[in-house]
Amino acid sequence: MPLVEIIHPQDAFDADGKKKLLESLSATCLRWEGIDVNDVTQSIAWVYLDERPRDSISAGGQPLTQNVYKVTVSVMVGFMDYGRIEGMVKEVTDAILAADGTEGTGAARVFVILNEVPSGTWGVDGKVWPSVFTAETVGLEPERVKRMDAAIQSRPRLDVPLA
């Protein structure tokens, strides 16, 4: 159930590039989370293209000489391991460079940050959706859900008493 935000300079993508990113990135991230891509899961996997004026982004304090991208992918904790993260980062980077027309010219301009949201801190329609509940809801196989639950339980949340 990824939420993807791409911060990019104005005019980095033409209309076709934007369309391709909006159509492909939710499916890409769902697949790397191990979630089946279908109409239901696609409806809760959102992509935001956040265009900024070119003069509001710098590299090393200097005006941009090429497009740079900050991609934040937020997922619930428990869905990704290192191999999945690595694959997703590569595929997202490749998709962005293809969309801006510079595929194969180097990816040091694309920073992908995975934000794993702790279980029990993601809300949908006014209700908290813990990772295991979400995994069951989107149809992950029971054995994977069981392993996910064990891993999450081994890293309990730190709740600070308010009183």
Give each language-model segment a name.
Residues 1-163:
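A domain-level signal for the structural core that forms small-molecule/cofactor-binding pockets
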